[in-house]
């Protein structure tokens, strides 16, 4: 296929259906027995190529992948075409048509693409238009064979054609064979290589019968598109089959219709209420989120039955992908070309000034091509965008020059400066959902308007500022038609500057030792309109080897910059316009706009300065994070997850940035604590980017030194460097390491002088700035991050004026994170995957853990599909799996979740839901019911406790050892879907003072973060003995008991945390533990006193055994003594299995069984159990059992009282 697809890119040419059928289906000269349909693509084939490169007869062995180019380009710039191989593509069948191209024609048309021919029906199905550019790639048909296909006949005639009437009418027909297609229909599908794509309709033409039959593809498995073979399971369903009522798609369709109606109503309301404030918008978002969660929960309840989908009744679980494979049709038409005029028609339309509403423009997705979707003259970083209706109402042409004036400063400032910008205005398609009567300005243009900081923050939140800005139309000169430069059209009333001086704005990403001449030269290739104090931004991206050599001439000597500061990284560098000189015009108020033309203007870069920067400029510059350069934009938006904490930090920092209204003689210091990986550093970076201040980030491990004087010098050096680039948010990661000293590392609790060091350094810096008239007045915001407050001394903590804690995400926050992570992934949501349930099962997972979970699930899904396809054909590759498409199933996520929970639980003791059911617990029926009343009732009916009556969340299980206390606690957690945190008393005891109490606090903190959760304290008597009776002189155990009691009292406020304790000796426990409100529900787990209960225990323990037919468990139980515990019965079952092992091994050694019998499953016989019973010794003697009965009477009486 090399010769046929050597060009890869082709142009679409659409033919009328009748003409297409006549040429390429019925009367094709290429192949008299062709199977072409209206949905076949005809590819040109030049006979003049070397025949050895391509054999036309092999086309019957191939399909092709069709990839549509989403960006419009000129045919003269074919090199700009980019093919992304790891995306889902459309699988289509094809045929060839012979063409004859001479060498001369080839030489003249090197830049022209060959055309592939499709029918009008095919163009509608594939959403293709004339002159669309597509990429074609062949794939062998055998690699796309599906394992299962489910078809719904659209009419009875189609069903009769494909089904087997004789079998379906038989009374002995199984439900499986009833839905299988007949062999004639199967053979027709295989011989003609019919393509199936879910959930599309398919029309099968039978030329022999001169009929067509129509079907809807309900499912393709495991790929989302492919063909069938003789081994494929093909299911056919009648249109009037009752089984269709079980499909959840009906409910989904109704919900979608309701959602569409609601969306239409919301759009109408939005059009009528353009001036609503932001608080109302936030309330609506919260309400929508809550409604969405409620609908998700309702859907989960409804799908308890609906989840038994169609194929559950036929063969085995399938995938319903009706909601996941629908491709979004991007509107790439030229709907707004009516208002895209030629430059010669641009000019002033009206001299009236208009008050306008402005908002900050969000980053435009990379799928939108500026040149074709907006205009080739559009400057993304400067020009404004509006809706087409707004452009009409302003009586403007697309690309008109306008002046926007900030009229609020006239009232607030005494200097009466008028801050204004001159930019172009463009309209864009409705894909960005721009509101009418609003001008959307990029961050740089908003910043250069010198908006007061209060409105600056509003705009950074994408709010709309009304009636504070004035729009004035500008008259522009007519460009030279013979000049190819598109930037000749500029306003005529702005003079050209003779000289401009710019200075580099100091921050951590820019260096005074590095030259940015190449980047600046590239920036000023276009003419610019600038005024004094404007900000310009460039990227340090290196485009060629010459720039790389020049950029490496000198290195930055800063040893504390993070690793992002290398020469090959793509950071943004900001420059400020300091001085503009012009002979024709005198700059009186410093706000005159000038034209900067590199041919006549001298551009000088000199010195450095301090300034704020535009809000969210990095994500805007890199267009939302799809570029590799914007690494942080691929993160989950933590400002929406931790909304309250984010707002608190912004409110604390804002007064320090309002220098004209507030003046402080101290620094803003903020301590941020939370578990590692929760997102502390990321959240602070988001704060800085929104507020328009620089970030200076340092890892304190680089500052630490065993020599105190050197460590102090490192701290001073970092603080001085950060203060030189203000306004700066200094982030000191792992701050607790600076508290360590040589003595503290040896467990000697000696406080460091860190707080005094910080006080002295900041005092020196502030005194130096105060005495220096030329020093900048911007603030230095000091923030530190720690993983635990326990690592800091009280003296250091008191130095910080504010403390903020980031806890692990709760259930609702995890739901938001998972929704964000899965929004662009092909996940089987609603059928096998529930985001709501997944958010419940990922308790204690952090943002990084959830991201890793989704990544692992995608890999597991790819492995699953790859293994299935390779069983049928081992030539398929992962990239071809991507092209065909596949779904991430619930099993893939469950496997990844189990792996991660296993690792987390073993490494950090994170809670997880166990896998123990009631079937694993034999007997104990009365205890089960009492426990479920205590735990399950407040979970399922929380409204019953809304009146203020406290719930009873503490249970104490006591009794002889081996009676199933731990197993029962795990079963409770499993049945109630609770996370289970098992704690053994001796594990919490530590030899150092205060460490044992700290361990108890951490256990309860983990449980709160992982709620709903059960904390199970095993061997509780070793952790909480009676106070005053301990032998330790230091009173360690007394303090431990007091800490435990304090935590138990605090549990009454947490409605979803339950405490279960287990002990063999309740008489040794501190009596305060068993008062009401703590462990006030005492349950005795004793030895079974009836043979029926013993039988249930043994039955539960052997339910996974391969028992012989002669095994009678009741007879086994009759031979057992009455003082056997659950652990004794476990030993009995284990000994019986061991006896069977010994018998098998002995027979194998003696040659009594052959190899085939050795590989058979191990079977346990009656004699194995009898032998185990005869050798069993009870673990609890009769005297001990009598003692436990006395204890039961004592504490059961106390419990009743």
Swiss-Prot record:
Known EC number: 3.6.4.-
Ranges of compositional bias, category Low complexity: 250-280
Membrane among keywords: yes
A Pfam family hit: AAA
Record-level GO BP terms: peroxisome organization; protein import into peroxisome matrix; protein unfolding
CDD domains: RecA-like_PEX6_r2
GO cellular component, one term: cytosol
InterPro entries attached to this UniProt entry: AAA+_ATPase (IPR003593), AAA_ATPase_domain (IPR050168), ATPase_AAA_core (IPR003959), ATPase_AAA_CS (IPR003960), P-loop_NTPase (IPR027417), PEX6_4th_dom (IPR056995), RecA-like_PEX6_r2 (IPR047533)
Main location: cytoplasm
Biased composition (Acidic residues): 284-297
Subcellular location as annotated: Cytoplasm, Cytosol; Peroxisome membrane
Reactions catalysed: ATP + H2O = ADP + phosphate + H(+)
Keywords for this protein: ATP-binding, Cytoplasm, Hydrolase, Membrane, Nucleotide-binding, Peroxisome, Peroxisome biogenesis
Annotated region described as Disordered, given as residue ranges: 247-300
GO function terms (MF aspect): ATP binding; ATP hydrolysis activity
Covalent S-S links between cysteines: none
Residues binding ATP, per UniProt: 959-966
PANTHER family named in the record: AAA-FAMILY ATPASE, PEROXISOMAL ATPASE PEX6
Family of the protein in this entry: Belongs to the AAA ATPase family.
Subunit text: Interacts with PEX1; forming the PEX1-PEX6 AAA ATPase complex, which is composed of a heterohexamer formed by a trimer of PEX1-PEX6 dimers.
Function: Component of the PEX1-PEX6 AAA ATPase complex, a protein dislocase complex that mediates the ATP-dependent extraction of the PEX5 receptor from peroxisomal membranes, an essential step for PEX5 recycling. Specifically recognizes PEX5 monoubiquitinated at 'Cys-11', and pulls it out of the peroxisome lumen through the PEX2-PEX10-PEX12 retrotranslocation channel. Extraction by the PEX1-PEX6 AAA ATPase complex is accompanied by unfolding of the TPR repeats and release of bound cargo from PEX5.
Protein name, entry field: Peroxisomal ATPase PEX6
């Amino acid at each position: 296929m090399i010769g046929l697809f050597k060009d890869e890119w082709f142009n679409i040419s659409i033919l009328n259906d009748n003409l297409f059928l006549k040429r390429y289906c019925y009367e094709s000269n290429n192949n008299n027995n062709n199977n072409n349909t209206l949905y076949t693509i005809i590819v040109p084939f030049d006979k003049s190529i070397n025949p050895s490169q391509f054999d036309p007869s092999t086309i019957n062995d191939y399909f092709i992948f069709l990839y549509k180019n989403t960006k419009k380009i000129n045919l003269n710039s074919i090199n700009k075409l980019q093919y992304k191989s790891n995306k889902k593509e459309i699988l289509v069948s094809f045929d060839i048509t012979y063409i004859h191209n001479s060498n001369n024609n080839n030489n003249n048309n090197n830049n022209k693409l060959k055309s592939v021919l499709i029918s009008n029906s095919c163009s509608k199905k594939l959403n293709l238009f004339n002159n669309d550019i597509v990429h074609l790639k062949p794939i062998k048909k055998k690699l796309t064979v599906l394992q299962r296909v489910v078809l719904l006949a659209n009419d009875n005639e189609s069903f009769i054609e494909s089904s087997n009437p004789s079998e379906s009418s038989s009374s002995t027909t199984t439900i499986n064979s009833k839905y299988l297609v007949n062999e004639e229909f199967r053979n027709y599908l295989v011989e003609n290589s019919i393509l199936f794509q879910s959930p599309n309709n398919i029309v099968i033409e039978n030329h022999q019968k001169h009929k067509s039959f129509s079907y809807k593809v309900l499912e393709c498995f495991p790929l989302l598109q492919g063909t069938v073979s003789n081994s494929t399971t093909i299911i056919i369903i009648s249109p009037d089959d009752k089984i269709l009522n079980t499909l959840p798609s009906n409910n989904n369709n109704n919900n979608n219709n309701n959602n569409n109606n609601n969306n239409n109503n919301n759009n109408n309301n939005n059009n009528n209420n353009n001036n609503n404030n932001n608080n109302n918008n936030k309330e609506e978002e919260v309400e929508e989120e809550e409604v969405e969660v409620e609908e998700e929960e309702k859907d989960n309840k409804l799908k308890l039955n609906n989840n038994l989908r169609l194929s559950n009744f036929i063969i085995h679980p399938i995938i319903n992908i009706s909601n996941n494979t629908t491709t979004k049709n991007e509107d790439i038409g030229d709907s707004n070309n009516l208002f895209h005029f030629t430059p010669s028609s641009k000019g002033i339309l009206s001299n009236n000034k208009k008050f306008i509403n402005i908002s900050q423009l969000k980053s435009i997705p990379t799928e939108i091509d500026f040149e074709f979707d907006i205009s080739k003259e559009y400057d993304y970083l400067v020009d404004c965008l509006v809706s087409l209706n707004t452009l009409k109402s302003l009586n403007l042409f697309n690309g008109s020059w306008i002046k926007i004036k900030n009229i609020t400063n006239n009232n607030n400032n005494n200097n009466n400066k008028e801050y204004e910008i001159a930019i172009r205005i463009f309209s864009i398609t409705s894909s960005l959902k721009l509101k009418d009567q609003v001008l959307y300005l990029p961050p740089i243009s908003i910043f250069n308007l010198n908006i007061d900081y209060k409105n600056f923050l509003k705009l950074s939140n994408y709010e709309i500022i009304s009636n504070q800005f004035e729009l004035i139309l500008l008259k522009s000169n007519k460009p030279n038609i013979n000049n190819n430069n598109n930037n000749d059209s500029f306003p005529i009333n702005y003079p050209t500057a003779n000289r401009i001086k710019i200075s580099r704005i100091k921050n951590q990403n820019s260096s005074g030792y590095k030259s940015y001449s190449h980047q600046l030269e590239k920036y000023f290739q276009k003419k610019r309109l600038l005024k004094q104090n404007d900000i310009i931004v460039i990227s340090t991206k290196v485009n060629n080897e010459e720039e790389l050599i020049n950029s490496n001439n000198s290195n930055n000597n800063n040893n504390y910059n993070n690793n992002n500061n290398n020469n090959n990284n793509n950071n943004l560098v900001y420059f400020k316009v300091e001085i503009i000189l012009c002979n024709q015009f005198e700059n009186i108020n410093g706000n005159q706009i000038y034209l900067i033309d590199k041919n006549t203007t001298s551009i000088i870069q000199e010195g450095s300065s301090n300034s704020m920067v535009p809000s969210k400029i990095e994500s805007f510059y890199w267009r939302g994070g799809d570029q590799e350069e914007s690494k942080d934009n691929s993160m989950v938006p933590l400002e929406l997850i931790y909304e309250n904490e984010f707002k608190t930090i912004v409110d604390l920092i804002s007064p320090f940035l309002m220098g004209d209204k507030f003046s402080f003689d101290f620094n803003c210091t903020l301590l941020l604590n939370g578990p590692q990986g929760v997102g502390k550093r990321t959240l602070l970076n988001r704060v800085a980017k929104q507020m328009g201040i620089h970030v200076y980030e340092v890892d304190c491990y680089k500052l630490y030194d065993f020599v105190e004087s050197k460590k102090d010098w490192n701290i001073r050096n970092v603080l001085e460097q950060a203060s030189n680039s203000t306004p700066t948010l200094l982030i000191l990661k792992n701050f607790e390491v600076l508290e360590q000293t040589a003595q503290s590392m040896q467990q000697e609790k000696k406080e460091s002088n860190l707080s005094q060091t910080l006080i002295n350094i900041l005092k020196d810096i502030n005194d130096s700035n105060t005495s220096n008239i030329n020093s900048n007045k911007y603030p230095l915001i000091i923030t530190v991050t720690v993983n635990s407050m326990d690592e800091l001394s009280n003296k250091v903590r008191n130095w910080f004026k504010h403390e903020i804690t980031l806890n692990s995400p709760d259930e609702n926050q995890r739901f938001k994170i998972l929704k964000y992570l899965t929004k662009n992934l092909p996940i089987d949501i609603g059928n096998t995957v529930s985001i709501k349930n997944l958010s419940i099962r990922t308790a204690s997972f952090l943002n990084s853990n959830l991201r890793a979970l989704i990544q692992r699930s995608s890999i597991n899904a790819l492995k699953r599909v790859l293994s299935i396809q390779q069983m049928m054909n081992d030539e398929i590759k992962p990239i071809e799996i991507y092209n065909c498409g596949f779904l991430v199933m619930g099993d893939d996520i469950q496997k990844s979740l189990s792996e991660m929970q296993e690792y987390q639980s073993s490494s950090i003791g994170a809670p997880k839901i166990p896998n123990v059911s009631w079937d694993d617990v034999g007997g104990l029926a009365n205890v089960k019911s009492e426990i479920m009343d205590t735990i399950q009732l407040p979970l399922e009916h929380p409204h019953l406790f809304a009146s203020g009556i406290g719930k009873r969340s503490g249970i104490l299980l006591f009794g002889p050892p081996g009676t199933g206390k731990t197993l029962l606690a795990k079963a409770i957690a499993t049945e109630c879907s609770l996370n289970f945190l098992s704690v053994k008393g001796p594990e919490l005891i530590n030899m150092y003072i205060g460490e044992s109490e700290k361990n108890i606090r951490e256990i309860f903190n983990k449980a709160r973060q992982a709620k709903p959760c059960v904390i199970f304290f095993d061997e509780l008597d070793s952790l909480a003995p009676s106070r005053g009776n301990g032998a330790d002189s230091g009173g360690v155990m007394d303090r431990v008991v007091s800490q435990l009691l304090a935590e138990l009292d605090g549990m009454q406020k947490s409605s979803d945390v339950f405490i279960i304790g287990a002990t063999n000796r309740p008489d040794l426990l501190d009596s305060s533990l068993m008062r009401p409100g703590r462990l006030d529900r005492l349950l005795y787990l004793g030895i079974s006193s009836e043979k029926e209960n013993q039988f249930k225990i043994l039955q539960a323990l052997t339910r996974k055994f391969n028992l012989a037919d002669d095994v009678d468990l009741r007879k086994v139980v009759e031979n057992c003594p009455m003082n056997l515990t659950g652990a004794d019965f476990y030993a009995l079952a284990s000994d019986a299995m061991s006896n069977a092992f010994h018998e098998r091994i002995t027979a194998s050694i003696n040659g009594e069984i052959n190899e085939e019998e050795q590989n058979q499953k191990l079977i346990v016989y009656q004699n194995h159990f009898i032998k185990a019973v005869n050798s069993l010794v009870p673990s609890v003697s009769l005297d001990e059992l009598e003692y436990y009965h006395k204890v039961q009477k004592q504490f059961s009486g106390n419990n009743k009282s």
